[in-house]
Regions:
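Short, structured interface segments
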Residues: 88-101
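Aromatic-rich carbohydrate-binding modules that target alpha-glucans
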Residues: 3, 11-55, 65-88
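Extreme N-terminus of proteins, especially the signal/transit-peptide cleavage junction
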Residues: 1-3, 135
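Non-catalytic cap/lid and distal C-terminal segments of serine-dependent acyl enzymes
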Residues: 8-27, 41-47, 53, 60, ...
């Protein structure tokens, strides 16, 4: 007999509602939602455990109690049954992209050829529910690591996504921000000539980061404004990322002023630029020689105190001092937040992204 533990990450707007596992095992109700396993909410997961004989194979689905509210993927499709064969104790972790009875917006793919990068980059684009009605333009939320921001099935690290579409939809329905077009920039698989992953090559200032920032500011934005109804005003554009993505977004703020009006920088990897910034004080020297930050923009920074993030406190403290010295208003034009228990993970960024949006759009 083995213990099978289910650990489910549910959509952020209904994550405290009951979640059930139903499937082809007696402990899961034999496909009867009325007899399914009800999970318990222990933030940020819904959890539950069953016992199963070794060698048993079972299939299962995730619902909110009936087939009308079963889980769907990021595209609104009902996925195939999940399967598990029992040999040892196991923890099955899954992320629900959305529910059938509330799926909203539309997710699509696009590609852009870049002269600057001498290649193509794939885009994942989420259009808000009202996009198909009328001819109005929408603010743009542009995010790095596009494979990780919408769809848990494509998230590179832990099958947990940022729930970017869910956060924007939830906050827009609550009046905390306007509806927006959300675009994720995907990075190619494989390695560069420098033996770095293509993602690290795209974003690192020691490698291709400057060229990638130029691509974003001078090629990608005009493409999006031409092919989608995005608002081209600076104050309507947000650029965001985590880790190296946050660092590249900050580089865009410095090197391409006047383009974006909002920046969401989660777990900014200042220590990853050791060749450029060999110590924390070098960050200030680098800031002093860069073009002045646009005084009219709004910037959100955060870092946790777990894993890689516990290295970032000193850099962020210096950055905050620099901005205040330059006359920036803490809490209004910028904020730097330390997140107790926060780490350098997609799950942690998923929890924190909503706060970034709330601050930047308030």
């Amino acid at each position: 007999m083995s213990l099978i533990r289910f650990r489910i990450v549910s959509p952020i707007d209904r994550r405290e509602e009951p979640v059930f596992i139903t499937g082809s095992h007696e402990a899961l109700g034999n496909w009867d939602p009325a007899r399914a396993l009800r999970l318990e909410w222990h933030a940020p997961f819904h959890t539950g455990t069953i016992e199963a004989d070794t060698g048993v194979h079972f299939e299962y689905k995730i619902t909110r109690g009936n087939w009308e509210s079963e889980a769907v993927d990021a595209w609104g499709h009902v996925p195939h049954n999940a399967q598990h064969e029992v040999w040892l104790d196991a923890t099955l972790t899954r992320t629900v992209a959305d529910w059938k009875d509330r799926y909203s917006g539309r997710l699509t793919h696009d590609r852009i050829h870049s002269r600057i990068l001498a290649g193509e980059r794939e885009l994942t684009v989420w259009l808000p529910p009202s996009y198909g009605r009328g001819e109005g333009r929408f603010p743009l939320v542009l995010l790095y690591d596009g494979a990780n921001v919408f769809d848990p099935a494509t998230s590179a690290i832990s099958n947990v996504d940022w729930a970017a579409d869910e956060w924007v939809d939830l906050l827009a329905r609550g009046g905390a921000m306007p509806e927006a077009v959300v675009v994720g920039i995907c990075h190619p698989e494989g390695f560069s000539e420098d033996n770095a992953t293509m993602r690290d090559f795209d974003l690192s200032p020691e490698l291709g980061g400057a060229a990638f920032a130029q691509f974003v500011a001078t090629e990608l934005l005009p493409y999006l404004d031409q092919h989608y109804r995005t608002d081209a005003r600076q104050e309507a554009r947000l650029l965001g990322g985590a880790g190296l993505g946050a660092l590249n977004a900050f580089h865009v703020a410095l090197a391409h002023p006047g383009v974006f009006g909002k920046f969401a920088c989660l777990s900014t990897s200042f220590e990853d630029v050791s060749q450029v910034l060999p110590d924390q004080s070098a960050l200030l020297r680098a800031l002093e020689v860069e073009p002045a930050l646009d005084k009219g923009v709004r910037m959100y920074f955060d870092h946790g105190d777990q894993g890689l993030d516990e290295c970032y406190g000193g850099y962020h403290a210096l950055l905050g001092g620099f901005l205040r010295e330059k006359g920036w208003q803490d809490g209004r034009e910028f904020t730097i937040r330390q997140i107790p228990g926060g780490g350098h993970t997609e799950l942690s960024w998923r929890e924190r992204f909503g706060e970034a949006l709330r601050f930047l759009f308030r």
